[in-house]
């Protein structure tokens, strides 16, 4: 591993190659109601 990053590689990086992606919420926290229902089910 090099101590310093390769700045030439960073500067020559082509941002046009990156694809635009849609961000989606994945791990949303359960509501208090959901937690209570799960506790009742056990």
Curated annotation (Swiss-Prot):
Sites of Phosphothreonine modification: 21, 23, 34
* Main localization of the protein described in the UniProt heading: cytoplasm
Give the residue ranges for region: Disordered: 1-42
Pfam families registered for this protein in UniProt: Thymosin
Basic and acidic residues composition bias: residue spans: 1-25, 33-42
Please list the residues that carry the modification Phosphoserine.
12
Q: Can you supply a Gene Ontology BP term from the record? A: actin filament organization
For the modification N6-acetyllysine, the affected residues are 4, 15, 39
List locations, semicolon-separated: Cytoplasm, Cytoskeleton
- The yes or no answer to whether the keyword Transport is present is no
Which Gene3D superfamilies does the entry mention? Answer: Single helix bin
Task: Give the GO molecular function terms.
Answer: actin monomer binding
Listed InterPro entries: Beta-thymosin, Beta-thymosin_sf
Q: Name one GO cellular component term.
A: cytoskeleton
- Which keywords label this protein? Acetylation, Actin-binding, Cytoplasm, Cytoskeleton, Phosphoprotein
Family the UniProt entry places it in: Belongs to the thymosin beta family.
- Task performed by this protein: Plays an important role in the organization of the cytoskeleton. Binds to and sequesters actin monomers (G actin) and therefore inhibits actin polymerization.
What is the name of this protein?
Thymosin beta-10
Question: What gene is behind this protein?
Answer: TMSB10
């Amino acid at each position: 591993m090099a101590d310093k990053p390769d700045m030439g590689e960073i500067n020559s990086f082509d941002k046009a190659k990156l694809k635009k992606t849609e961000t989606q919420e994945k791990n949303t926290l359960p509501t208090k109601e959901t937690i209570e229902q799960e506790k009742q089910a056990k």
